C-alpha cells in the first residue's frame, strides 16, 4: 500500500511540472525551423488560392467565370468560399497578421465589387521550389523573427533569396506580409 501511495504522489508531482513546461513552450518565443517551413508553405498556398479566387480544398464551392473591368484591370469574382471579406479574412487570419491582410488587399487590388469579393486576373504561381528551401534566422527581437530563405528555382538555374518576417500576434506566430512566399 505504501508503494502505491508513493507512486501516486510521484505522478502528482511530475504531472504539474510537465504541464507547466508545455504551457511555457506554447507561449514562449520559440519558433523552430520546421514550424517556419510549414507556415511558409501554408502562406504560399493561401496567397495563391487568394489570387486565384478559389480554395481547391473547399467543399461545395461554386464559382463564376464572369470577368469584368475594374479600374482598368480585368477582374473576376472569387468563388463562394471567399465570397465576402469576412470569409476571405477568416481564411487568411490563421497564417497572416491583420496588417499583412490589410496591406495585401490594397497591394493586390482585392476588393468587394457589387457585394462580392473579386480579384484582378493574374498569371499565378512562379518557378521556385519552396519545399526545398533552406532557412537561416537573421534577426530576433521580442516577438519578431526574420528568416532568410534560399529558394532553388525548379529548373535549377538560380537560387532566389527571400526574407520573411514572423510576428507573434494574439500569442500565435504569423507571417507579416501576404506575398512573402512567392
What positions do the PLM features span?
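Positively charged n-region of N-terminal signal peptides that target proteins for export
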Residues: 1-4, 8
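Short acidic DE-rich linear segments
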Residues: 7, 23-27, 179-182
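Bacterial N-terminal signal peptides
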Residues: 8-16
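Sec-dependent signal peptide cleavage junction
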Residues: 15-29
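Terminal targeting/leader modules
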Residues: 22, 146-155, 160-161, 176
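Core segments of small alpha/beta cavity-forming domains
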Residues: 29-117
